[in-house]
Amino acid sequence: MVRDDLRCRAGNETHWDPTAYMQFARLRQRPVVELLDHVDLYSPERIYDLGCGTGIATELLARRWPQAELHGVDSSAEMLEEAARLPIRASWERANLQHWCAERPASLLFAAAVLHFIERHCSLLPRLLGQLSPGGCLAAHMPNWRDASWYRLMLDALDSAGPGGTPLGSPTLRYLMQQRNVLSLDNYYRLLAPLCAEVDIWETEHLQVVDGNDPIFDWVKVSALRPVLGELDEEARRRFLDRYLDLLHRYYPQELDGRTLFPFRRVFVVASLRR
């Protein structure tokens, strides 16, 4: 049976938890640095950090371009409250990115680990490009987790952890969790190349080495698992966690040094407009 402390940690995931999210801040910062290294802008006037969360990327953007007008945008009041404590010059806006529009054209739209939550990239990305100034840049990285082992194990638990091996949650939840918002690399190119002067697209797998008794769960519960943990009632959540934690421990055993290997794939996109 899953431990009581895990039930408490997973109890209500309808809100973002800044403290839990920052548990792996160094590892979450790594793809941001990789993405920034591919952004070729000398002195952007106006930067929007989309899905800024606690400001991990916002702070790096402020360091690189201290003179830029910097805006952090996120849907979570809890995350924005944490980000506002950073010692940087930035404004903070609470908004749903599905409907958000920049007040003024952006030199850089920076989206770290957020666009994979939004559907219909074939219309989303052109809409974001339309909010750039001439020569502006859209830079994004997205976890490509639909084929990851921990995600497939989550789907397995959702489909079979109910009484007698029945599914948990609503059919709508199970359908949504099976959807794939992130496109293939070649489809991103076909979408963006006709609209841009330059497009740089790549995929990276980082072998993340994580600490703790349940590090894979601690990582995914604050992001990918939020819809599941937010919908399931207490009994269904208990059944789900019993099954899912057991599967994770079997598939991701601790190494001899007590740490856990957590391979993680991400797609990177840098799309620049003509001047």
Swiss-Prot record:
InterPro entries: Methyltransf_25 (IPR041698), SAM-dependent_MTases_sf (IPR029063), Trans-aconitate_MeTrfase (IPR023506), Trans_acon_MeTrfase_C (IPR023149). Transmembrane segments: none annotated. Its EC number is 2.1.1.144. GO terms for cellular component: cytoplasm. It is an enzyme of class 2 (transferase). It comes from the Bacteria. It catalyses: trans-aconitate + S-adenosyl-L-methionine = (E)-3-(methoxycarbonyl)pent-2-enedioate + S-adenosyl-L-homocysteine. Catalyzes the S-adenosylmethionine monomethyl esterification of trans-aconitate. This is Trans-aconitate 2-methyltransferase. It comes from Pseudomonas paraeruginosa (strain DSM 24068 / PA7).
